[in-house]
């Protein structure tokens, strides 16, 4: 039996609101606000608990060390971690902000995952995203690659290095990829969504060439579909496809303006996948879709064969979005349950439930090859929660990013997390 494991990003101890992400309306709207790293991480852990309580398998990916002194040394800064960070704080504050970002929490951007039934060699392929469009995100790529190799080291997995960093190869991972299939173990249709051609108001975060490369590396290109995100969606603030569309098994939930070539895409999907269920929200504006992050919900398969939507509180608080959710629940489709989660700390930086997780479909044999340190049950989740409550800072103001005390606190928190990861799991 094949199941899907959600690997959520643990929100790191330097979570802050530096407003680093062009095209991300929430990020810019909240730039300069005081963040709460401890509350942010606890909110994420509560979401993980919600999935466990639904009977699903849950994993997590740890944040890389931040501030990233190890990366800054590659730029010529020398000395101890504290000395390196002090130099950067004095010479290039924007670079320090980028090196302090906790944006690795959004593991939907960690990699593109291609399921074993679809790939040329029958392995699960993870193509690490280069995240080359944004400086702060690009600093994650090598760390993410190392983490993925640590988690998925078995022969059932193929973890690919990030694509070369180039203007026309920007790759932002699973946030721009959807897989549709009769079930997680069946052969599926991989849909790669890329941005509009360069020259618009916001940057092309996902390049067509990058999507083609990911498909080629996993051997799914001959059967893959490539669709362009609509310019209207991007202008409205949908900087990734997962802000306007989400798919699970044979269900596609999408805004009618999500794709530039919607009729052709839906026709091709219907032809390839008998039993496809398309749910479109015809009474929800793009503005409400982005404000509520309805489509950035997690759509998950439940043990009883039905599906649940994991939505942010913003979707409940937006009247138009909540009406659409009730309509979905009342209609004839597999979605029978909705769970509301509070992710305000992440949402204020533009990341909802779907941003915070990387979906990895695995058969039983492959699951046994996953490093157990990164899988959670309720007891391990309790331990991780206590760790965050002990070591994560309560608050970070913009000026705190230059404070050596914060750098030291973050290093201590990361050391405690590494101790958790290397301790026996049974």
From Swiss-Prot:
Keywords: Arginine metabolism, Hydrolase
Pathway: Amino-acid degradation; L-arginine degradation via AST pathway; L-glutamate and succinate from L-arginine: step 2/5
A GO term, aspect molecular function: N-succinylarginine dihydrolase activity
Annotated substrate binding sites: 18-27, 109, 136-137, 205, 242, 349
Keyword Electron transport in record: no
Keyword flag Hydrolase: yes
EC class: hydrolase
Top-level taxon of origin: Bacteria
Entry EC no(s): 3.5.3.23
Gene3D superfamilies cross-referenced by the UniProt entry: Succinylarginine dihydrolase
Recorded coiled-coil stretches: none
Pfam families (alphabetical): AstB
GO biological-process terms attached to the record: arginine catabolic process to glutamate; arginine catabolic process to succinate
Catalyzed reaction equations: N(2)-succinyl-L-arginine + 2 H2O + 2 H(+) = N(2)-succinyl-L-ornithine + 2 NH4(+) + CO2
Active site: 172, 240, 355 (nucleophile)
Entry-linked InterPro entries: AstB_sf (IPR037031), SuccinylArg_d-Hdrlase_AstB (IPR007079)
Annotated function: Catalyzes the hydrolysis of N(2)-succinylarginine into N(2)-succinylornithine, ammonia and CO(2).
NCBIfam families in the cross-refs: PRK13281.1
Stated family: Belongs to the succinylarginine dihydrolase family.
Assembly and oligomerization: Homodimer.
Protein name according to UniProt: N-succinylarginine dihydrolase 1
UniProt source species: Caulobacter vibrioides (strain ATCC 19089 / CIP 103742 / CB 15) (Caulobacter crescentus)
């Amino acid at each position: 039996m094949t199941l899907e494991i959600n690997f959520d990003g643990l929100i790191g101890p330097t979570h802050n609101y530096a407003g680093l992400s062009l095209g991300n309306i929430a990020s810019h709207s909240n730039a300069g606000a005081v963040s709460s790293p401890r509350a942010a991480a606890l909110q994420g852990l509560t979401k993980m608990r919600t999935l466990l309580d639904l009977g699903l398998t849950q994993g997590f990916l740890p944040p890389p060390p931040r501030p990233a002194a190890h990366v800054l040394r590659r730029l010529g800064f020398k000395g101890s971690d504290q000395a390196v960070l002090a130099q950067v704080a004095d010479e290039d504050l924007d670079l320090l902000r980028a090196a302090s970002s906790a944006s690795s929490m959004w593991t939907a951007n960690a990699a593109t995952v291609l399921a074993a039934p679809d790939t040329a060699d029958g392995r699960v392929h993870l193509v690490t995203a280069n995240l080359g469009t944004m400086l702060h995100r690009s600093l994650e790529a090598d760390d993410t690659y190392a983490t993925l190799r640590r988690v998925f080291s078995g022969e059932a997995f193929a973890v690919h290095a990030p694509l070369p960093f180039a203007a026309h190869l920007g790759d932002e991972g699973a946030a721009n990829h959807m897989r549709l299939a009769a079930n997680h173990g069946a052969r599926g249709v991989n849909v790669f969504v890329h941005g509009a051609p360069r020259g618009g108001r916001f940057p092309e975060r996902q390049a067509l060439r990058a999507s083609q490369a990911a498909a080629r590396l996993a051997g799914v290109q001959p059967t893959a579909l490539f669709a362009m995100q609509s310019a209207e969606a991007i202008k409205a603030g949908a900087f990734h496809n997962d802000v306007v569309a989400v798919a699970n098994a044979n269900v596609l939930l999408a805004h009618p303006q999500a794709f530039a070539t919607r009729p052709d895409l839906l026709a091709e999907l219907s032809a390839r996948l008998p039993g496809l269920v398309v749910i479109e929200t015809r009474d929800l504006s793009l503005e409400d879709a982005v404000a509520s992050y309805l489509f950035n919900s997690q759509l998950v398969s439940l043990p009883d064969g039905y599906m649940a939507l994991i939505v942010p509180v913003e979707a409940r608080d937006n009247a138009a979005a909540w009406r659409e959710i009730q309509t979905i629940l009342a209609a004839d489709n597999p979605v029978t349950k909705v769970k509301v989660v509070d992710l305000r700390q992440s949402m204020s930086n533009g990341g909802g439930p779907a941003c915070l997780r990387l979906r990895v479909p695995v058969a039983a044999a492959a699951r046994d090859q996953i490093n157990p340190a990164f899988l959670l049950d309720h007891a391990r989740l309790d331990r991780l929660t206590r760790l965050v409550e002990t070591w994560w800072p309560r608050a970070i103001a913009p000026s705190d990013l230059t404070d050596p005390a914060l750098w030291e606190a973050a290093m201590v928190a990361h050391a405690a997390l590494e101790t958790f990861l290397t301790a026996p799991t049974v």
